[in-house]
Amino acid sequence: MALKITGKAEGQLQLHLITKQKQFAVPDVPYSIRANVSTKELNVLVNTLLKDAGNAEAGKVEFDFLLNGEFPLGQHLKERDVSFEDTVELEYVERYPAPEPQDCLLHDDWVSAVEARDNWILTGCYDNTLNLWTTKGKHKLTIPGHIAPVKGVTWISLDEEKGVFASASQDQTVMLWEWNVAANSVECVQVCKGHERGVDCIAANGSKTKMATGSWDTMLKIWSTDVRSGGGDSEPSTSKRQKLDQGSARTPLMTLAGHRECISGVQWIDDNTLVTSSWDHTIKIWDLALNGIKSEISGNKSFFDLSYSKLNGLIITASPDKNLRLYDPKSNQGTLVKNTYLGHTQWVQSVRWSTTNEYLFVSGAYDNHVKLWDYRSPKAPIFELIGHEDKVLACDWSNPRFILSGGSDNSVRVFKSKIAIGGEK
């Protein structure tokens, strides 16, 4: 894609090349280039300058180029009008390499929840079960217990001996599970009851002491993650079946009202602050110290999911109008959409930020596609992750090495991310 130059003169353009990645910096002097220069030609220019400077990375790295903070030169993007009289400042960044398909984890029913932790993948399904897999694709456990589809899963803790995780279901309960890694056995140690309709989303806080759930009953509830008795459950931990039969239950630490329709997504900003999305067209930020709503962002469409990034402080949302939207909760103009991302052709069901790259997020939609985005490129995703044969219901990027997605084709697709923590290959 070429820069479009407006003005009487044609032919040459004065360009300053800048980068925030100091290891790839070139001399800060104006360069004279053709007005219709392409991304490929700019890559040759930058790599030639790096080679002339004796940079060992010269020729090994491909770059993308940004004008006014957005990618103007990539495929599918519209041309920008640039005045010939101006010296153009063009930022270049290392191009994110394409994720590679690694595995397809086949389940017995729709996969509606997925979350990775270290080398393990936890999934929740419409056949009411949870499943544990290794990131190499080996199935370890099928876990029955719920009596309706599982809509959310979250890891609480994991070490070499024991794992603790929770699941949220349309059966109105949240179950807290303890997994003996060596014996590969799992036990439901707490059943959390209090919601009056199906539970649609769940998330644990950063210190893993509490978890939050959102439901079709419009309520946000906060629970203890302590596997021991307490939080409303005074009975010693027994087997899952005994607990269900006897009706013993952990009660919530807190119930917060404010939404008018289903709470579709919940994330912790810090241990005292949460953000939720809802079908009622609002995003609400909650302060647990105040026991209520701190602020609110209103949209004109239902929100099916949201993701909050601790790296950049921004919120990305998924909606049924096929679009993703970016919000800054700290902005005085927080109700205004900072950007809208176009590319899906059906409802967008799920969205997740990268936990190690402040610019990247993934989305999954009813068009069977998972897309990888750079928030500086709103007109098109940087990659499409192909594989699902039916609707994508959930996606996850908790482990920076793997992008995961679950769908109504009964599968979890595993894509290996080339760049992990700190640019590690």
Curated annotation (Swiss-Prot):
<feature type="repeat" description="WD 3">
    <location>
        <begin position="194"/>
        <end position="233"/>
    </location>
</feature>
<dbReference type="InterPro" id="IPR036322">
    <property type="entry name" value="WD40_repeat_dom_sf"/>
</dbReference>
<dbReference type="InterPro" id="IPR012972">
    <property type="entry name" value="NLE"/>
</dbReference>
<feature type="repeat" description="WD 4">
    <location>
        <begin position="258"/>
        <end position="296"/>
    </location>
</feature>
<dbReference type="InterPro" id="IPR028599">
    <property type="entry name" value="WDR12/Ytm1"/>
</dbReference>
<comment type="function">
    <text>Required for maturation of ribosomal RNAs and formation of the large ribosomal subunit.</text>
</comment>
<feature type="repeat" description="WD 1">
    <location>
        <begin position="106"/>
        <end position="143"/>
    </location>
</feature>
<dbReference type="GO" id="GO:0043021">
    <property type="term" value="F:ribonucleoprotein complex binding"/>
</dbReference>
<keyword id="KW-0853">WD repeat</keyword>
<dbReference type="GO" id="GO:0000466">
    <property type="term" value="P:maturation of 5.8S rRNA from tricistronic rRNA transcript (SSU-rRNA, 5.8S rRNA, LSU-rRNA)"/>
</dbReference>
<dbReference type="InterPro" id="IPR001680">
    <property type="entry name" value="WD40_rpt"/>
</dbReference>
<keyword id="KW-0677">Repeat</keyword>
<feature type="repeat" description="WD 2">
    <location>
        <begin position="145"/>
        <end position="187"/>
    </location>
</feature>
<dbReference type="GO" id="GO:0070545">
    <property type="term" value="C:PeBoW complex"/>
</dbReference>
<keyword id="KW-0539">Nucleus</keyword>
<dbReference type="GO" id="GO:0000463">
    <property type="term" value="P:maturation of LSU-rRNA from tricistronic rRNA transcript (SSU-rRNA, 5.8S rRNA, LSU-rRNA)"/>
</dbReference>
<protein>
    <recommendedName>
        <fullName>Ribosome biogenesis protein WDR12 homolog</fullName>
    </recommendedName>
</protein>
<feature type="repeat" description="WD 7">
    <location>
        <begin position="387"/>
        <end position="425"/>
    </location>
</feature>
<keyword id="KW-0698">rRNA processing</keyword>
<feature type="region of interest" description="Disordered">
    <location>
        <begin position="227"/>
        <end position="247"/>
    </location>
</feature>
<dbReference type="GO" id="GO:0030687">
    <property type="term" value="C:preribosome, large subunit precursor"/>
</dbReference>
<feature type="repeat" description="WD 6">
    <location>
        <begin position="343"/>
        <end position="383"/>
    </location>
</feature>
<dbReference type="GO" id="GO:0005654">
    <property type="term" value="C:nucleoplasm"/>
</dbReference>
<feature type="region of interest" description="Ubiquitin-like (UBL) domain">
    <location>
        <begin position="13"/>
        <end position="94"/>
    </location>
</feature>
<dbReference type="InterPro" id="IPR020472">
    <property type="entry name" value="G-protein_beta_WD-40_rep"/>
</dbReference>
<dbReference type="Pfam" id="PF00400">
    <property type="entry name" value="WD40"/>
</dbReference>
<keyword id="KW-0690">Ribosome biogenesis</keyword>
<feature type="repeat" description="WD 5">
    <location>
        <begin position="298"/>
        <end position="337"/>
    </location>
</feature>
<comment type="similarity">
    <text>Belongs to the WD repeat WDR12/YTM1 family.</text>
</comment>
<dbReference type="InterPro" id="IPR019775">
    <property type="entry name" value="WD40_repeat_CS"/>
</dbReference>
<dbReference type="InterPro" id="IPR015943">
    <property type="entry name" value="WD40/YVTN_repeat-like_dom_sf"/>
</dbReference>
<dbReference type="Pfam" id="PF08154">
    <property type="entry name" value="NLE"/>
</dbReference>
